[in-house]
């Protein structure tokens, strides 16, 4: 009888064990100093995996969480200029509305959205700007956010896929 109980316990313990596997869209988290301002970006990096992304998986004209899984986050240690608007120091969600020739980029005040906020609230947009798209010579397998052209007065945030 003890042996039988032991087998049941052993079976229960092994059936409850979870096999941990890598995320399909791994999290990226980095900090960059630009001038005297610390910028931190956290996002998930979806992969193409043979899929058509723009205009298909991510439809044109729809708001996108700008990554996968949870919404992408950006924080600034100091006030920054986004386009022609001052964005206060703090943490924001990054959302985008892709189109073929340009993207609308939104810095959204609510950061605990776990994806797209429901409902979308225009009054929570802290800043937005429209940027032109450029074709890359080599597509990237993984969606990438980077901070480039860094100098003491500013930098560019690049979204590439």
Tell me the role of every PLM-derived stretch.
Residues 1-20:
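Bacterial Sec-dependent N-terminal signal peptides
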Residues 12-15, 46, 94:
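Residue-level detector of alpha-helical segments with a strong bias toward transmembrane helices
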Residues 13-14, 88, 153:
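Generic detector of short, well-ordered, non-transmembrane alpha-helical segments enriched
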Residues 14, 52, 62, 78-80:
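Flexible, active-site-adjacent loop/turn segments at secondary-structure boundaries
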Residues 18-59, 111-161:
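Primarily secretory-pathway and cell-envelope proteins
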Residues 55-71:
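Aromatic- and Gly/Pro-rich amphipathic surface segment
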Residues 66-114:
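Mid-length scaffold segments of soluble, non-membrane domains
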């Amino acid at each position: 009888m003890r042996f039988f109980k032991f087998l049941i316990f052993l079976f229960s313990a092994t059936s409850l064990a979870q096999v941990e596997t890598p995320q399909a869209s791994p999290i990226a988290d980095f900090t960059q100093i630009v001038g005297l301002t610390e910028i931190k970006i956290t996002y998930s990096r979806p992969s193409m995996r043979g899929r058509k992304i723009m205009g298909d998986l991510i439809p044109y004209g729809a708001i996108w969480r700008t990554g996968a899984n949870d919404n992408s986050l950006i924080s600034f240690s100091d006030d920054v200029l986004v386009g022609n608007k001052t964005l206060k120091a703090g943490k924001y969600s990054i959302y985008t509305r892709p189109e073929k020739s340009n993207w609308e980029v939104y810095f959204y005040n609510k950061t605990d959205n776990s994806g797209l906020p429901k409902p979308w609230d225009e009054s929570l947009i802290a800043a937005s700007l429209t940027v032109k798209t450029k074709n890359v010579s080599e597509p990237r397998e993984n969606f990438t956010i980077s901070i480039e052209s860094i100098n003491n007065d500013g930098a560019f945030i690049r979204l590439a896929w």
